């Protein structure tokens, strides 16, 4: 038996040498080394789409062209394993985050679909995610983004960034979100900028900057939006689920429902930036709808439900571990939450028709 292993050992060593040689002939940069807003936007070879990291790093073969945006400039490097490292991707300026109107309705006649992404000189625009905006009230309807667990590699969240204004000229988005402007009767409760596409889901630090737009947030009670609230908890659970299933790419839809019979606005005088009564999230993969979640925005609680059967658990307690994947707090101030399969919505589906049509193309 030992002579057999001795006889093949040269072959094994040769194969090992080839593997090592192939690995040494590639360029790799960990996304954990790109934790600065003044880092590049790395592109695919088409130079018009974002390159997705794998297992927390970018990789190129020796001699392969590396395309990236630095500030507003499109640049190119050639993969040379001895010379490519994170320092080669330092930029003087951060990426230019902007939106592009793609001229498509998404929730009624007053709605417009926008792509959020990064702009470079020469008219180049690289899209990242898509959002639906209600132009008459300057309010968000819903947002769609991709989530791939294998992309991540220890990238922390951004510090609280200034949100970028959106497409309603003259509207003082930032002012209306201040506590002084809101004048809430109980100072414990006030509206925050509720992310729809959370920056946590963006694997690359510079990509996170694109989520800080007023086109991607709605007024949300602080006790629901902050850590310990059910919307924050839902974002966290979806993110962890994606990391535990790293080979599956998810498409996430995040949106809100407004009350047409009792409209409330953050900008009261202008009747802009509508305050939602529900938040919703749909998690899908390439062929199936995993679940649809609803989080109430009523601090006094609600008996309304959109699901025939609640497939979430509502016995989460602060400071204790839970074995359930989808477990939430049963407290109105944190946002009463229920969830179900897409088919469980039956005739009660409250989502925009355009979203329903897109999701119905998947197998449920």
UniProtKB/Swiss-Prot annotation:
Top-level EC class: hydrolase
Record GO biological process: apoptotic DNA fragmentation
Keywords, comma-separated and alphabetical: Endonuclease, Glycoprotein, Hydrolase, Magnesium, Nuclease, Secreted, Signal
Intracellular or extracellular location(s): Secreted
Glycosylation: residue positions: 285
CC cofactor: Mg(2+)
Top-level taxon of the source organism: Eukaryota
Signal peptide coordinates: 1-24
GO cellular component, one term: nucleus
InterPro entries for the chain: DNA/RNA_non-sp_Endonuclease_sf (IPR044929), Endo_G_ENPP1-like_dom (IPR001604), His-Me_finger_sf (IPR044925), Non-specific_endonuclease (IPR040255)
Catalytic activity, EC: 3.1.-.-
Single GO MF annotation: nucleic acid binding
Tissue spec. comment: Saliva (at protein level). Female salivary gland.
Biological role stated in the UniProt entry: Hydrolyzes double-stranded DNA with no sequence specificity. Does not cleave ssDNA and RNA. May facilitate blood meal intake by lowering the local viscosity created by the release of host DNA.
Family: Belongs to the DNA/RNA non-specific endonuclease family.
The protein, known as: Salivary endonuclease
Organism: Culex quinquefasciatus
């Amino acid at each position: 038996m030992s002579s057999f292993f001795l006889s093949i050992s040269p072959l094994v060593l040769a194969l090992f040498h080839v593997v090592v040689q192939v690995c040494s002939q590639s360029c790799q940069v960990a996304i954990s080394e790109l934790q600065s807003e003044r880092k590049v936007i790395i592109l695919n070879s088409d130079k018009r789409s974002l390159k997705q990291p794998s297992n927390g790093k970018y990789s190129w073969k020796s001699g392969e062209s590396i395309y990236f945006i630095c500030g507003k400039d499109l640049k190119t490097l050639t993969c040379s394993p001895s010379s490519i490292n994170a320092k080669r991707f330092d930029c003087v300026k951060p990426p230019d985050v902007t939106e592009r109107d793609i001229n498509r309705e998404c929730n009624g006649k007053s709605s417009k679909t926008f792509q959020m992404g990064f702009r470079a000189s020469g008219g180049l625009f690289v899209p990242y995610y898509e959002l639906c905006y209600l132009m008459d009230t300057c309010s968000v309807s819903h947002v769609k983004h991709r989530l791939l667990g294998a992309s991540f590699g220890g990238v922390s969240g951004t510090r609280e960034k200034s949100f970028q204004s959106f497409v309603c000229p003259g509207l003082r988005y930032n002012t209306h979100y201040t506590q002084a402007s809101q004048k809430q009767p109980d100072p414990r409760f006030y509206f925050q900028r509720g992310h729809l596409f959370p920056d946590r889901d963006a694997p690359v630090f510079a990509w996170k900057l694109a989520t800080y737009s007023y086109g991607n947030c709605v007024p949300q009670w602080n006790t629901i939006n902050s850590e310990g609230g059910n919307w924050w908890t839902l974002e966290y659970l979806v993110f962890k689920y994606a990391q535990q299933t790293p080979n599956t790419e998810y498409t996430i839809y995040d949106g809100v429902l407004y009350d047409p019979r009792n409209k409330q606005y953050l900008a009261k005088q202008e009747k802009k930036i509508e305050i939602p009564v529900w938040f919703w999230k749909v998690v899908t993969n390439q062929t199936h709808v995993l679940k649809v979640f609803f989080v109430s925005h009523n601090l006094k609680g609600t008996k309304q439900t959109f699901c025939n059967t609640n497939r979430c658990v509502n016995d989460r307690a602060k400071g204790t571990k839970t074995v359930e994947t989808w477990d939430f707090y049963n407290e109105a101030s944190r946002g009463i939450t229920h969830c179900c399969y897409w088919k469980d919505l039956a005739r009660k589906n409250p989502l925009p028709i355009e979203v329903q049509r897109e999701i119905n193309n998947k197998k449920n």
